[in-house]
Amino acid sequence: IGQNQRLAKAHSKARELIASGAIGKVLTFRTIFGHGGPETWSIDPGSNVWFFDRSKAAMGALADLGIHKTDMIQYVLGAKIVKTQAVLTTLDKRDATGSLIGVDDNAICIFEMDNGAIGTMTASWSYYGREDNSTVVYGTEGIMGIYADPQHSIVVHKKDGGTLYYDTDAIQTNAS
């Protein structure tokens, strides 16, 4: 799998800032990748998209989207996942017959990192209206939002009240 989120300039800059102590020791984080689902952008759009077929895809939103955020958070934090818990479910997506699809359309994982930080990763195919491809990292000296602000790639809110803005690039999107 090509881990394309590592190539995003804001993720590289965030990694550099975190390693330099810009937000102190990382305590917790949340990372999200959610959109309206592959039927809205795939080469074979609609309710018969291969992503929904368990015999072809095996897994859903977790494998499609979550794998990228799982890799990205380890890259940005410079830490490895040592323990995880997950809930995968199908809440809304239906196939051409009207039945719930055979793979997950939503997944939430709790990660424990080898540096002691804990956080969540959410992958969803049922974020209707606007894609969310953001990460927020909470440290002892501040909070870093990565692609969480519509105007700035990275925003760091410092414990002392200061705010730093970094404009590197826009996040990749599946939006039409």
For each of these PLM feature ranges, what is it?
Residues 22, 58, 140, 159-160:
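Intrinsically disordered, low-complexity segments enriched in small/polar residues
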Residues 116, 135, 145, 163-176:
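C-terminal helical cap and adjacent loop that interface with cofactors, partners, or active-site loops
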Residues 28-43, 48, 143-146, 150-168:
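Mobile, glycine-enriched helix-loop/loop "lid" segments at the mouths of ligand-binding/catalytic clefts
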